[in-house]
Amino acid sequence: MSEELSADTSYTEDDFYCPVCQEVLKTPVRTAACQHVFCRKCFLTAMRESGIHCPLCRGSVTRRERACPERAIDLENIMRRVSGSCRCCSKKIKFYRMRHHYKSCKKYQDEYGVSSVIPNVKISQDSVRSSNRSETSASDNTETYQEDTSSSGHPTFKCPLCQESNFTRQRLLDHCNSNHLFQIVPVNLQLDEETQYQTAVEESFQVNM
């Protein structure tokens, strides 16, 4: 792949990955001041979270950029010409087709459990403690409820956002902070924050039954 790049560009393979979701860029956009590139959806989500700063370097971003970021057309064109290796099966794929490949790559599915998503809602330790209370409630009210257990006999849990399973409580927290930090999740405004999280966790338990 380096030979393909060196022929007409100074880009490296890392330049084709979004620094927010850590996946191959999808509809790449570029900041005017610092020239950093992100997936369009990742950038707009980060703007709603952080306001006026670049998600990578905290540089300034104009109001116009926050609403309508400039597409990195030059990078899109290069991604259509240059191939990279799938991170799981090592198959050579054009970068602009890489995310589509992930959806059918069995090794990718086995490794990550779900095709690439943008990632995310940050889950705090307080939320995890809330989930502990919901576990007790679920076990009291559901006669057929049974926790999954790992080979070591400890209970395991399924991520309520991407459905990946076999997490301990701490690994579930780490997974959500790593993979779902900026994911937008539909919110029922009639429920308070703790009730929303408890509902998601209880649904996860029911899937594991």
UniProtKB/Swiss-Prot annotation:
Please give the superkingdom of this protein's source.
Answer: Eukaryota
PROSITE patterns xref list: ZF_C2HC_RNF (PS51803), ZF_RING_2 (PS50089)
Provide the disulphide bond pattern.
Answer: none
Q: Where is this region: Disordered?
A: 125-154
Q: Which residues bind Zn(2+)?
A: C86, C89, H101, C105
Question: What pathway or pathways are given for this protein in its record?
Answer: Protein modification; protein ubiquitination
Q: Where are the zinc fingers (C2HC RNF-type)?
A: 86-105
Q: Coiled-coil annotation: which residues?
A: none
Please indicate if the UniProt record lists DNA damage as a keyword.
yes
Where located? Chromosome
Top-tier EC class: transferase
Q: What would you give as a GO molecular function for this chain, any one?
A: ubiquitin protein ligase activity
Please state every residue range assigned to the domain named UIM: 189-207
In this UniProt entry, the residues modified to Phosphothreonine are T142
Zn finger (C2H2-type) start-end: 157-180
Chief location of this protein within or outside the cell: nucleus
**Zinc fingers, RING-type class:** 18-58
Q: What is its EC number?
A: 2.3.2.27
Pfam families per UniProt: zf-C3HC4_2, zf_C2HC_14
Assembly, in brief, is: Interacts with NLK. Interacts with XRCC5/Ku80. Interacts with RBBP8/CtIP.
What domain comment accompanies this record?
The zinc finger domains (C2H2-type and C2HC-type zinc fingers) bind DNA and mediate recruitment to double-strand break sites. They show strong preference for DNA with 5'- or 3'-single-stranded overhangs, while they do not bind blunt-ended double-stranded DNA or poly(ADP-ribose) (PAR) polymers.
Functionally, this protein is described as follows: E3 ubiquitin-protein ligase involved in DNA damage response by promoting DNA resection and homologous recombination. Recruited to sites of double-strand breaks following DNA damage and specifically promotes double-strand break repair via homologous recombination. Two different, non-exclusive, mechanisms have been proposed.
Name the chain's protein: E3 ubiquitin-protein ligase RNF138
Task: Identify the species of origin.
Answer: Rattus norvegicus
